[in-house]
């Protein structure tokens, strides 16, 4: 019991990390975009790559597989074939997409969820204290490009989340090795 109490005193618990990540992303979004989230429409045209990616994810959610939408060339493909994202990435977006439903901006909502999970897991695994969490948020806010690409229909949020998970897990393993050795 003492170990748990000491751990909670030194580092925020997972729920606080998740809450902090959500508050940070909401603050970032409203400071940068000043548009209510329910009024966001990302693509400029229906042939935009982000709209095509969204259609692929929606077709996986509604039909169980892609319905022939590719990206980049704004062309169509055979039904059941995956485009440039490939099946792994489409299904990686379709699974959290089940939480949000088959809507117009399902990829945006998945991106926001993925980056929030990445930041929260990194902060928890790296055992950042409150001041370090604030510094992390300040650093992410100052470079801004990774966060801007997460508020989109592109797949960069998945890449950033995976990078944060890998670095956070490596920090946790390093700390555990120091304690054990």
Predicted regions and their residues:
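Start-transfer (signal-anchor) and selected internal transmembrane alpha helices
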Residues: 1-36, 124, 172
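Membrane-interface starts of transmembrane alpha-helices
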Residues: 12, 102-110, 131-133
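Alpha-helical transmembrane segments
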Residues: 25-26, 116-120
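Extracytosolic helix-loop segments that constitute the early lumenal/periplasmic catalytic or substrate-binding loops
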Residues: 33-38, 50-80, 88
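Alpha-helical transmembrane signal-anchor/signal-peptide segments
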Residues: 38-45
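Hydrophobic transmembrane alpha-helices
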Residues: 58, 93, 97, 119-127, ...
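Aromatic- and kink-enriched transmembrane "portal" helix at the membrane-lumen/periplasm boundary
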Residues: 83, 87-90, 104-108, 112-118, ...
């Amino acid at each position: 019991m003492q170990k748990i109490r000491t751990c909670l005193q030194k580092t925020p618990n997972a729920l606080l990390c998740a809450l902090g990540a959500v508050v940070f992303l909401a603050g970032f979004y409203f400071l940068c975009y000043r548009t209510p989230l329910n009024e966001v429409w990302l693509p400029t045209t229906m042939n935009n790559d982000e709209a095509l990616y969204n259609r692929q994810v929606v077709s996986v959610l509604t039909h169980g597989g892609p319905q022939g939408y590719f990206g980049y060339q704004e062309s169509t493909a055979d039904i059941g074939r995956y485009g440039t994202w490939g099946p792994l990435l489409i299904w990686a977006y379709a699974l959290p997409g089940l939480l949000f439903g088959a809507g117009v901006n399902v990829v945006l909502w998945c991106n926001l969820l993925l980056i929030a999970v990445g930041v929260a897991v990194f902060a928890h695994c790296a055992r950042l204290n409150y001041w370090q969490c604030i510094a992390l948020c300040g650093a992410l806010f100052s470079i801004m490009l990774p966060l801007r690409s997460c508020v989109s229909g592109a797949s960069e949020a998945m890449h950033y989340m995976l990078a944060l998970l890998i670095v956070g897990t490596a920090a946790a393993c390093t700390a555990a090795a120091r304690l054990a050795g």
